[in-house]
Regions:
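Catalytic glycan-binding domains that act on GlcNAc-containing polysaccharides
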Residues: 22-160
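N-terminal signal peptide c-region/cleavage motif recognized by signal peptidases
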Residues: 16-18
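Sec-dependent signal peptide recognition
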Residues: 2-10
């Protein structure tokens, strides 16, 4: 009887593991932003709110507005992609056409204004790397302005 129970549990876990391994994209941004917000000492929810404004879309899995990791903004137009690979390919195509000012990822970091933010385009679309840079940048703004609200207001309209 115990053997049968163990087999049933093992089969159930094996069947569930692909679903568990494939976390929905909005959750990747939320978790990365929350962790980097705490690590940088940013008031809880502030970086998350900026992320929702910058790359928010209705998450198909939850119905909530959440930062979306596979987002780009080029010439004022936001584009949401289903995969990281699609987003990277779109940025490469835009760059090949001469466009340089492109916002990428959960926190919509501008590649022209922040040319040294990421070692590669792939890294720019990594939710943790993207959120980490955004947290550092917001913290730098706060250090000079001494005001979180003003710093948040300057997040997208200020260069490093």
């Amino acid at each position: 009887m115990r053997w049968m129970l163990r087999c049933t549990i093992s089969i159930s876990l094996l069947a569930a593991s692909p679903a568990m391994a494939q976390e929905e994209p909005g959750a990747l941004c939320r978790a990365a932003i929350r962790a980097e917000e705490a690590a940088a000492g940013i008031p809880p929810g502030l970086l998350q709110a900026i992320g929702r404004v910058e790359s928010g879309r209705r998450d198909p899995a939850t119905g909530r507005i959440a930062p979306w990791p596979w987002t780009i903004n080029a010439e004022g137009r936001g584009h949401f992609f289903q995969t990281r690979e699609e987003a990277i390919a779109a940025v490469r195509q835009l760059q090949a056409g001469g466009m340089r000012s492109i916002d990428v990822g959960c926190m919509q970091v501008n590649l022209a204004a922040h040319p040294n933010a990421f070692p590669s385009l792939e890294a720019a679309f990594d939710p943790v790397t993207n959120a980490r840079y955004a947290a550092r940048f917001l913290s730098e703004l706060q250090a000079t302005r001494r005001d979180w609200a003003r710093s948040a207001g300057n997040y997208h309209s200020n260069t490093p």
